[in-house]
């Protein structure tokens, strides 16, 4: 279906925030559940999706304390793992909600000097795109470490790409440079 290419897919958006990714997934036909540890984020997401008459199930929870029996075709962990204290535990908790052969996407920040300069010094202190203290460089995750944790939780790496932000046109592009942002695709085995 061209209008709803994600029809019949169940998606879990972990760390959904205000629903910025949950909403377009729902509009593309997916059955979306969005979870976030912040009740304020969940309230904002519900309010916004209700105004658009979208059927998104928002729950205030983290994957570690989520009490549902559902299994999902796709799990989105977008820009969240660099904020958790134990990435391995987080991936373990997340992966238990993934169907066999299901896909998990993880977008995060690499642990490099360049990522420190761009994501913290540049984005927080110089450009003020983010509040100061949003990121802790110690929590950034190298792709090799993420792969190790994923493989230990029955997830096979399918692909890893760099995500490059172009400040001139305000767009993200997929590329080879993983030194700042990257996105990994894993499959449940």
Model-derived features: where do they sit?
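Short, flexible, mixed-charge acidic loops at enzyme active sites
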Residues: 116-125
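Acceptor-substrate binding/catalytic loop of class I
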Residues: 108, 128-145
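Core SAM-dependent methyltransferase catalytic element
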Residues: 171-189
